UniProtKB/Swiss-Prot annotation:
Entry-linked Pfam families: 3HCDH, 3HCDH_N, ECH_1
Annotated GO biological process: fatty acid beta-oxidation
Protein name: Fatty acid oxidation complex subunit alpha
Catalytic activity: a (3S)-3-hydroxyacyl-CoA = a (2E)-enoyl-CoA + H2O; a 4-saturated-(3S)-3-hydroxyacyl-CoA = a (3E)-enoyl-CoA + H2O; a (3S)-3-hydroxyacyl-CoA + NAD(+) = a 3-oxoacyl-CoA + NADH + H(+); (3S)-3-hydroxybutanoyl-CoA = (3R)-3-hydroxybutanoyl-CoA
Species of origin: Shigella boydii serotype 18 (strain CDC 3083-94 / BS512)
GO cellular component entries: cytoplasm
Enzyme Commission (EC) number: 4.2.1.17, 5.1.2.3, 1.1.1.35
Length: 714
């Protein structure tokens, strides 16, 4: 059976050819290897029709042009040579489009990413819509790859090398106006006239290339180029800590093209693409992509979710304000905030105002749209306006009696169908629901701070939570732009449970003489975005350590923090960044002065600050405890799958994405090797390093958590 075509050619009466892109039975247009023959057949027809005046590529999808290449193609490649051949095929196809003798215009609406932007770059002109859905970028680096269909060569020549490097090295996506300003597109128009404008452009001669700014022309020359690549290379190395080989290869390939010409550049691009596709880093990053896509499709339970028309929030503090923002501005739902005093409501409203006003200043949002989104948020000091809310999110202090009181008040003042979702980070949901008259509608919904930035939420049903309550809460989290994982109602849930021993071990090393900056630098080098001690300062030492007694009571001595250290720090009024002093000292708010380790911290905790451990030794001790606890969480069914465990660690605490998450990392080392490392550490440092039974059994049998493919579990 012949596959339905994703590319359809229609020639208008004015001799403009319209090529419509519509991948059958898919929400998003993605480029697949099998489409090459379809496009070549169309190109042949275009060349044979001497009456044609121009060509327009346009998508039939409502919200995307082409979202990139189908990543499964790369997974199907068994060798670097196969992946390289895939890149060369893409390059050849783009070259054939570019070589057409008549103007070729890309009419872009929605996501134009990766291979989609490479196709648009191969066209002679580009027009895009002013719709917020329209974004242009080359995100391949986020999968441990580089653009393989000519993007590394065409983009620098179109918009300048420094701007192109920023886009390719970071995967940064541009909005329509940014793309126009940089010369990436020739015009920005309303969606209603996109095709009309693109057709008119196609009737003209090929658009002449826009002269690059003087700065970009200087940087493209030999001297400027040498300086630029040295500076960018240094900055990139500092940012990636050498953990992402794709960034180094991007610099190498772009520089080759500029120094030796496009032919050498294309050759270097294809070879680098093939080699990068086989790296463990790319395989891990692609596994995270597939896992997160999978999680986003997971409804959480088999029951249909209830309707969601409006939400209430209890508490206008930092978390309440952040939750109100994502509910109104991402989910588009009306939000009513209740706080015991007007200042709390004002704080929450200001939180959303600050976020939206920042977008207006950066020209990412119109002032009218800001006002429209803010109008969705209202406040009250009582329960007026709460009667018909579908779901209430509680974000008050971590106090069990207070939260139980909130449940009682919501059941008294809200509708019979209203769901009560607690944002607790440590209290058992079953205890919060203990006195509820409708316990089946009580659930945990644990956000991470800052709410607008952290992608993960933990959804925690207790034993009596209904399947519909789970499904409805998952539905809300997705509308808020979050990646939800459903976890069991056990102390610490998942993320905080695997994080606590990691941070405890860092503090323990600190008390034994390791320096603050050495510990943090070791874990950043390993691949975490910040070190464990800085993380504690950022979260708030008082907040971050509150869970330790809860975990110690539930799981025993392995969760105990070094004696008296935490109390000594808190008694000295050290809360971290929020009050300007923790393990680090911080400059005045609003000033860009760098944080500095406070030398007074060492005598305060009775340490010398003259450690002997190497960076890998420091990282090993922290990370191994995290891995061990993650395996326990699978064993105790705290998480439903290792997929959720990997996603939770990467999105919740910044576990190095290039390692794929705790379970992929264990697989890459081998369970037997992890057991051997932990047994060695247990001999050196104590029983907290004893590998759990599941890990020992897997090591003995040579088992792994994942199969070899990117998406399959054992």
């Amino acid at each position: 059976m012949e596959m339905a075509s994703a590319f359809t050619l229609n020639v208008r009466l004015d001799n403009i050819a319209i090529i419509t892109i519509d991948v059958p039975d898919e929400k998003m247009n993605t480029l697949k290897a099998e489409f090459a023959s379809q496009v070549r057949a169309i190109i042949k027809q275009l060349r044979e029709n001497k009456e044609l005046r121009g060509v327009v590529f346009i998508s039939a999808k409502p919200d995307n042009f082409i979202a990139g290449a189908d990543i499964n193609m790369i997974g199907n490649c068994k060798t670097a040579q196969e992946a390289e051949a895939l890149a060369r095929q893409g390059q050849q196809l783009m070259a054939e489009i570019h070589a057409l003798p008549i103007p070729v215009i890309a009419a872009i609406h929605g996501a134009c990413l990766g291979g989609g932007l490479e196709l648009a770059l191969a066209c002679h002109g580009r027009v895009c819509t002013d719709d917020p859905k329209t974004v242009l970028g080359l995100p391949e680096v986020q999968l441990g790859l580089l653009p393989g269909s000519g993007g590394t060569q065409r983009l620098p020549r179109l918009i300048g090398v420094s701007t192109a490097l920023e886009m390719i090295l970071t995967g940064k996506q541009l909005r329509a106006k940014q793309a126009l300003k940089l010369g990436l597109v020739d015009d920005v128009v309303p969606h209603s006239i996109l095709l009309e404008v693109a057709v008119e452009l196609a009737k003209k001669d090929r658009p002449s290339s826009r002269p690059l700014p003087v700065r970009e022309r200087i940087l493209a020359g030999p001297l400027g180029r040498a300086l630029l690549f040295k500076m960018v290379g240094k900055k990139t190395e500092h940012k990636t800590q050498g953990n992402y080989p794709a960034t180094e290869r991007i610099l190498e390939v772009v520089e080759t093209g500029l120094a030796q010409g496009t032919s050498s550049g294309y050759d270097a691009e294809a070879r680098a693409f093939g080699e990068l596709a086989m790296t463990p880093q790319s395989q891990a990053l692609r596994s995270i992509f597939f896992a997160s896509t999978d999680v986003k499709k997971d409804p959480g339970s088999d029951a249909p979710p209830a309707p969601l028309n409006s939400v209430g929030i209890l508490g206008g503090g930092l978390m309440g304000g952040g939750i109100a923002y994502v509910t109104a501005c991402k989910a588009g739902l009306p939000v009513r905030i209740k706080d015991i005093n007007p200042q709390g409501i004002n704080h929450a409203l200001k939180y959303s105002w600050d976020q939206l006003e920042g977008k207006v200043r950066r020209r990412h949002l119109k002032a009218s749209e800001r006002d429209k989104q803010l109008a969705l948020i209202s406040g009250t000091t009582d329960y007026r306006g709460f009667a018909h809310r579908d779901l209430i999110i509680e974000a008050v202090f971590e106090n069990l009696e207070l939260k139980q009181q909130m449940v009682a008040e919501v059941e008294q003042n809200c509708a019979a169908h209203t769901i009560f979702a607690s944002n607790t980070s440590s209290l058992p949901i079953g205890d919060i629901a203990a006195h509820a008259t409708r316990p089946e509608q009580v659930i945990g919904l644990h956000f991470f701070s800052p709410v607008e930035k952290m992608p993960l939420v933990e959804i925690i049903p207790h034993a009596g939570t209904s399947a519909q309550t789970i499904a409805t809460t998952v539905k809300l989290a997705k509308k808020q732009g979050k990646t939800p994982i459903v976890v069991r109602d056990k102390a610490g849930f998942y993320v905080n449970r695997i994080l606590a021993p990691y941070i405890n071990e860092a503090i323990r090393m600190l008390t034994k003489g390791e320096r603050v900056e050495h510990i943090d630098a070791a874990l950043v080098k390993f691949g975490f975005p910040v070190g464990p001690i800085q993380l504690l300062d950022e979260v708030g030492i008082d907040t971050g350590t509150k869970i330790i007694p809860v975990l110690e009571a539930a799981y025993g001595e392995r969760f105990s923090a070094p004696a008296n250290v935490v109390s000594s720090i808190l008694n000295d009024d050290r809360k971290g960044r929020k009050n300007g002093r923790g393990f680090y000292l911080y400059g005045q708010k609003g000033r860009k002065s760098k944080k500095q380790v406070d030398p007074a911290i060492y005598p305060l905790i009775g340490a010398q600050g003259q450690g002997r451990l190497s960076a890998p030794q420091v990282a090993e001790r922290c990370v191994m405890l995290m891995l061990n606890e993650a395996v326990r969480c699978v064993d105790e069914q705290v998480i439903r799958s290792v997929r959720d465990g990997d996603i939770g660690a990467v999105f919740g605490i910044g576990f190095p994405p290039f390692l794929g998450g705790p379970f992929r990392y264990i697989d890459s080392l081998g369970a037997g090797e992890v057991v051997a490392i932990m047994q060695r550490l247990a001999t050196q440092y104590g029983s907290r390093f004893t590998p759990c039974e599941r890990l020992v059994e897997m090591g003995a049998r040579g088992e792994s958590f994942w199969k070899t493919t990117a998406t399959d579990l054992q």
